Amino acid sequence: MVSPRGPARGADPVGNTLRDEGTIDERESFIDATFAAAKGGGEAVGLTKRGKGVKILAIVDRHGLPLSVSTHAANHHEVTLVQLSFDFYMLEAKPEHLIGDRAYDSDGLDDDLKQNGVNMIAPHRSTRKLKTQDGRHLRRYERRWLVERFFAWLQWKRRLLIRWEYYATNFLGFVQLACITMLLKQF
């Protein structure tokens, strides 16, 4: 894991300014991850069935603007990386509702986030024995396309499609620079 004391600190004033203006609304946030191939190898690269790679984990607000972006080795499951992604969160207040796909359906994750005041909403996996939701909160899941659109915007940056950097902090810097350019378009 890359230390959050690096480039993430530069995004804090931008995020807080946009929040004060009402552009960012963190009450309802969406989480997902995407894969970037790492052709050159390097640190924090995980082997998967698709080859060497990096996982880009993002939390976006209800308008599709990034609130947290982090990079991790691709061989880790997304549930184990959610708490680490809050180290890169650029606002003081955490979201009330965090909406994810079926990969985030975990009782342990639900309990951990509930202790921090965050309600995790994810559809149940087909193998789940005990149902914990009745479906009312899943109406928020329909807007999860916002995080997919964010990744589409992010992958327009050719530099981020394939990781050529050896050091993980350099690649994280490019990812966060792309997110800052998205946020600066809101001014």
Where are these regions (language model features)?
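Short alpha-helical elements
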Residues: 1-187
